[in-house]
From Swiss-Prot:
Single GO MF descriptor: NADH:ubiquinone reductase (non-electrogenic) activity
Residues annotated as transmembrane: 15-35, 46-66, 89-109, 120-140, 142-162, 177-197, 221-241, 264-284, 289-309, 317-337, 347-367, 393-413, 426-446, 471-491
Protein known as: NADH-quinone oxidoreductase subunit N 1
GO cellular component, one term: plasma membrane
Functional description taken from the UniProt entry: NDH-1 shuttles electrons from NADH, via FMN and iron-sulfur (Fe-S) centers, to quinones in the respiratory chain. The immediate electron acceptor for the enzyme in this species is believed to be ubiquinone. Couples the redox reaction to proton translocation (for every two electrons transferred, four hydrogen ions are translocated across the cytoplasmic membrane), and thus conserves the redox energy in a proton gradient.
A Pfam match: Proton_antipo_M
Membrane topology, as annotated: Multi-pass membrane protein
UniProt keyword list: Cell inner membrane, Cell membrane, Membrane, NAD, Quinone, Translocase, Transmembrane, Transmembrane helix, Transport, Ubiquinone
C-alpha cells in the first residue's frame, strides 16, 4: 500500500503552508494559555496576530509559486491529488479572511477583558475558523469543501456562545448550532446526490459529467433535487432569505467582535464556496438555478431592508442590513451570464472587500460602547456620541454612509458594479428594484446617525478607546476611504483575482 508521504510532495505542503502556519500558532496559543498568569493574557492576542502575519508571509511564498507556473491555459497551483488549489481567486479571499480575523482580534482585546472572558481558546478558535475558510476558498473537492465548512462552523458556534454568563449569548449559540447542523445536513445530502449522479467528488469531473447529463435531460429530477438541496445549504451560510433566521439572533447574542468577524469573514467564506460551486461545478445548470437566484435575491432585499426599519438594537439592525447586502450580491451572480459580462463577479468581489472594512468599522464603534454595566448595543446607547467622542462619531458616520452606498465612499463602488452588471445583461427591472431598496436602506442607517449626532446622551459615562480598538477603527476607516477615493488601484487587484480554477471558457470569468 502506498504510504501518505509517497502520495504527497513538497508542493502539496507548500500549497497548505498558510493553513499549517495558522494551525501551529493556534495550538501554541492553547498551550501558552495554560501557563500564562492572568495579567498576561494579552499575549494570546499578540500571538494570534503574529500567526496571521506569518500566514500572510507564507501566502506570499505560495503566490510566488502560482505566478511562476501561470500560463494562458493554467492559472492555478493544485495539490493533494487535485482536491486543493491555489489560484488568484483563492489568494484574494485568503487576504480578506486574514484582514477580517486580525481586525476582529484587535477589537476583542479590551472587550473580552471587560467581559472577563479573555481566554486563549477564543483567539485559537478565530484561527481555526480562518483555516476552515481557507479550505472553503481553495477546495476543488466536495469532501474538502464540507470539512472546511464544518471546521469554520464549529469554531463559530463556540465563539457565538463564548460569553458563558450571558443568556443571550447562550441562546444565540444554541439556535445557531441547531439551524447550522440542520442546514449542513441538507447541504451534505445535496453533495451526496451529486456524487451519486457523477461518481466523483472533484468539481472539474462533476461539471463535465453534469454538462453531458443536462444536455440529455435538462429536467433530470435527481439533478434538480441535488441543485435545490445544495443551494439551500449554501444560501443558509450567507444568510439569504428565507434561510436567514439564525443571523439576527446570532449577531445580537454573540460578543460584538465575533459579530463583526461573522458578518465579514464568515460571510466571505460562504461566498467563496458558493462562487466556486455555482460558477464552475453547477455552471451546466445555470438555466435551472438562475430563476431560483432571482427569487431569493429579491426576497432577501425585501426581508432584510424592511426588517431593519423597525430594529432598536444596533447589532440586530446591522444583521438585517447584512442580509439585504446579500440580496444585492446575489444579483451580481444572476448577471454573470458567462458570455459578455464578468462585471457581476467583479461587483461581488469589490462588495465583499469594502463590506469587510465598513462593517468591521461600524462594529468597532459599537464595541467601544461596552463599559462597566453598559452593554452598548442599543440605539439609546449611541445617543450623544458626537458630544462624548466626536472623532469616533464621525468615523461611524463614514461607515454608515459607505454601507448606504453614498459616493465617494467604498460602498458606492460595490453597488455600482452590481447595478452596472444588471444593465449590461438586460436585467433592467432588477436594477430598478435594487436601486429602490438601496434608497430605502439609507433610512435605517440615518436612524443610527441621528442617535449619535442629534440626540442627547442618556448617560455620562465617557467613551474610552483602547489602542488596539483604535487601530481596528483606523484600519477600517483607511480601507473604507482608500477604496472609495482611489478605486482604480483596488480594481486592478480585483481584475487580477478574476481567475477561478478550472476551465475559464466554461465559467466565463476570463476573456
Amino acid at each position: 500500500m502506498t504510504s501518505l508521504p509517497n502520495l504527497l510532495s513538497r508542493s502539496d505542503y507548500l500549497l497548505a503552508l498558510p493553513m499549517l502556519v495558522l494551525s501551529g500558532f493556534a495550538v501554541a496559543i492553547l498551550l501558552l494559555d495554560l501557563v500564562l498568569p492572568k495579567g498576561w493574557k494579552r499575549w494570546n492576542a499578540a500571538l494570534a496576530l503574529a500567526g496571521l502575519a506569518a500566514a500572510t508571509m507564507s501566502l506570499a511564498k505560495v503566490w510566488q509559486a502560482v505566478y511562476y507556473i501561470e500560463t494562458p491555459e493554467s492559472k492555478r497551483f493544485s495539490g493533494f491529488l487535485g482536491s486543493l488549489v491555489m489560484d488568484r481567486f483563492a489568494i484574494y479571499f485568503y487576504l480578506l479572511f486574514i484582514v477580517g480575523a486580525a481586525v476582529a482580534i484587535l477589537m476583542s482585546i479590551r472587550y473580552m477583558e471587560i467581559e472577563h472572558e479573555d481566554h486563549g481558546e477564543y483567539h485559537a478558535l478565530i484561527l481555526f475558523a480562518t483555516i476552515g475558510m481557507m479550505c472553503m476558498a481553495s477546495g476543488m473537492d466536495l469532501i474538502l469543501l464540507f470539512v472546511g465548512l464544518e471546521l469554520m462552523a464549529l469554531s463559530t458556534y463556540v465563539l457565538v456562545g463564548f460569553l458563558k454568563r450571558d443568556k443571550r449569548s447562550n441562546e444565540a449559540a444554541l439556535k445557531y448550532l441547531l439551524l447550522g447542523a440542520f442546514s449542513s445536513g441538507i447541504f451534505a445530502y445535496g453533495l451526496s446526490l451529486f456524487y451519486g449522479l457523477t461518481g466523483s467528488t472533484n468539481l472539474t469531473e462533476i461539471a463535465n459529467k453534469l454538462a453531458q447529463r443536462m444536455a440529455d435531460n435538462p429536467r433530470d429530477p435527481i439533478a434538480l433535487l441535488a441543485l435545490i438541496t445544495t443551494a439551500t445549504g449554501l444560501l443558509f451560510k450567507i444568510a439569504a432569505v428565507p434561510f436567514h433566521q439564525w443571523a439576527p439572533d446570532a449577531y445580537e447574542g454573540a460578543p460584538t467582535a465575533v459579530t463583526g468577524f461573522m458578518s465579514v469573514a464568515v460571510k466571505a467564506a460562504g461566498w467563496a464556496m458558493l462562487l466556486r460551486i455555482f460558477l464552475f461545478m453547477l455552471w451546466p445548470m445555470r438555466e435551472q438555478y438562475t430563476p431560483i437566484l432571482i427569487f431569493v435575491a429579491v426576497a432577501t432585499m425585501i426581508g432584510g431592508n424592511f426588517a431593519a426599519l423597525t430594529q432598536t438594537n444596533v447589532k440586530r439592525l446591522l444583521a438585517y442590513s447584512s442580509i439585504s447586502h446579500v440580496g444585492y450580491m446575489l444579483l451580481g451572480l444572476v448577471a454573470s451570464d458567462g458570455k459578455n459580462s464578468s462585471t457581476g463577479i467583479k461587483g461581488i468581489l469589490v462588495y465583499l472587500a469594502v463590506y469587510t472594512f465598513m462593517n468591521l468599522g461600524a462594529f468597532a464603534v459599537i464595541t467601544s460602547l461596552r463599559r462597566r454595566d453598559i452593554i452598548g448595543d442599543e440605539l439609546d446607547d449611541l445617543a450623544g456620541l458626537f458630544f462624548k467622542a466626536p472623532s469616533e462619531a464621525v468615523l461611524l458616520l463614514v461607515f454608515l454612509l459607505s454601507l448606504a452606498g453614498i459616493p465617494p465612499l467604498a460602498g458606492f463602488w460595490g453597488k455600482y458594479y452590481i447595478f452596472l452588471s444588471l444593465m449590461e445583461t438586460g436585467h433592467y427591472t432588477l436594477a430598478v428594484v435594487a436601486v429602490l431598496f438601496a434608497v430605502l436602506g439609507m433610512y435605517y442607517y440615518l436612524r443610527i446617525a441621528n442617535a449619535a449626532f442629534m440626540r442627547e446622551a442618556v448617560d455620562a459615562e465617557p467613551v474610552k478607546i483602547s489602542p488596539s480598538l483604535g487601530a481596528a477603527l483606523w484600519i477600517s476607516a483607511l480601507g473604507t476611504l482608500g477604496i472609495g477615493l482611489f478605486p482604480e488601484v483596488f480594481l486592478r487587484i480585483v481584475n487580477w483575482s478574476l481567475a477561478l480554477s478550472g476551465d475559464a471558457r466554461v465559467i466565463g470569468l476570463l476573456r
